[in-house]
């Protein structure tokens, strides 16, 4: 059997960890949290309106 320093699993964990770290850095450094919350709020409103319109048609 061949033993390597890095396996596919550990590299996947490393990639996801890096992405999570970059996301957290964006939230703390660039104050992206408020922008993201505003985006989610707008999307929620839009989806509620679509649901109401679809329910009204039935």
From Swiss-Prot:
One of its GO terms (biological process) is tricarboxylic acid cycle. It is a peripheral membrane protein. It is found in: Mitochondrion inner membrane. The keyword Kinase does not apply. Pathway: Carbohydrate metabolism; tricarboxylic acid cycle. The keyword Kinase does not apply. Its main location: mitochondrion. GO terms for cellular component: mitochondrial inner membrane; respiratory chain complex II (succinate dehydrogenase). It comes from the Eukaryota. Keywords: Membrane, Mitochondrion, Mitochondrion inner membrane, Tricarboxylic acid cycle. Component of complex II composed of eight subunits in plants: four classical SDH subunits SDH1, SDH2, SDH3 and SDH4 (a flavoprotein (FP), an iron-sulfur protein (IP), and a cytochrome b composed of a large and a small subunit.), as well as four subunits unknown in mitochondria from bacteria and heterotrophic eukaryotes. This is Succinate dehydrogenase subunit 8B, mitochondrial. It comes from Oryza sativa subsp. japonica. The lineage of its organism: Eukaryota, Viridiplantae, Streptophyta, Embryophyta, Tracheophyta.
């Amino acid at each position: 059997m061949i033993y390597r320093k890095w396996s596919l699993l550990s590299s996947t964990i490393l990639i996801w960890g890096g992405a999570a770290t970059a996301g957290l850095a964006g939230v703390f450094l660039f104050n992206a949290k408020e922008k993201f919350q505003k985006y989610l709020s707008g999307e929620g409103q839009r989806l509620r309106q679509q649901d109401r319109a679809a329910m009204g048609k039935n």
